[in-house]
Amino acid sequence: MRYSEWMRIFGLALLAGLPLASAFAQEVESEALEAVDYGDIDNWLCHPGNTLDVCGHDVSATIVNADGSVELEAWTADPDPGIDCFYVYPTTSLDEDTWADLHPGRHEEVITAFTQFARFKSVCRAFAPVYRQITIPGLLMNAGNLANNDQRNYIDVANAFNHYLENHNDGRGFVLVGHSQGTSLLIELIRNEIDGRPLQDQLVSAILAGNSVVVPKGEVAGGSFSEVPLCESAGQAGCVISYATYRDNIPPGGEGLFLFGRAPNEDSEVACFNPANPGGEGELDAYLSNIGEIFQGVAPMPVWSSAAPGISTPFVKVPGLLSARCVNDGTYHYLEVSIAADPADPRTDDIRGDVLIDGQINAPWGLHLIDMTLAMGNLVDIVRMQAEAYAGR
């Protein structure tokens, strides 16, 4: 199947509800589902006890200024953070079966977890389980079948979270971090384990990007969750941050059905929290990936600065280039990203993050691939403030 065709089907599967914990039928109905042993450190991508911790690698960045000059931004993890972060990665596996195995691929789970989550180690202990997610090929094989599944992706995430609680939490506050399929699984986890239950008192926040958290119009709770509210400020603890990103010049709407930001009915709306400025427009503190290993359908790495080629750090910052605001057009509620390009200076005038089909931007996806990295610095700062608010309440 051509890349353009599987991306089309992938999008249709998302629209049909794929990212929810309900997944696809697997031809193993007569077999008992064997539980993953989360006492085995090899079943964690990120874990304080894992010597091969994916989140333990260097996440230093090169700052590319508006004049094209560059400077190094070093990074260190907090050796004794007061809270924990539990992360569930998005749909990324290219394993050929419907469900991913427990052997993470470098170009899929490993790089995704590294780019989306490792930087949080500056504010929290990092836990990221390997789980048997629905794979990208699995979406294609089962795009028309959303019933009679064994929900192993959700079962794995719930078991990993409960293992963390029983063996590592010790009453500490925690942040849940997810994207896309990971977000949908965390939505189910919050509903089943946290919302309105004693464990809610330990929730510092939940960052649920790249999928829909729904509330009644004008409300902060009562849709996806009965009691866990949406965040209304950067320093608020015990709440949910959620958003999906689109370019300002390619907004959702018009022809075609866009994948993110649309509420299920006219009485509700999808959450949009702007990490750059919850009250309006603000500058995105992006940590853009400078890792050259990409799959087809993603634009090549830009030349960050023609005046300083050869940047080698895993991340690049472009201060002043990117800003964002939440837009609600009555149908879609989304995070609009603007680029302050200046063709006269040597710095890049664009970023990569769109899904490409046959070399053209596939508009319904928006900037889904970089939802997290676009606001990474903002999110880490917010978690730091939320941790302080949590400790002081």
Predicted feature residues:
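Bacterial N-terminal signal peptides that target proteins for export
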Residues: 1-10
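Bacterial N-terminal signal peptides
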Residues: 10-19
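Sec/Tat signal peptide C-region and signal peptidase I cleavage site
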Residues: 20-25
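N-terminal module-boundary/linker segments of secreted carbohydrate-active enzymes
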Residues: 26-71
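Active-site catalytic motif of lipid deacylating hydrolases and related acyltransferases
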Residues: 42, 48-51, 77-81, 87-173, ...
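Active-site-proximal beta-strand/loop segments in catalytic clefts of secreted hydrolases
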Residues: 88-91, 130-134, 179-180, 208-212, ...
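Surface cap/lid and interfacial helix-loop subdomains adjacent to catalytic sites
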Residues: 151-170, 191-353, 357, 389
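Gly/Ala-rich beta-loop-alpha elbow adjacent to hydrolase catalytic centers
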Residues: 178-182, 186
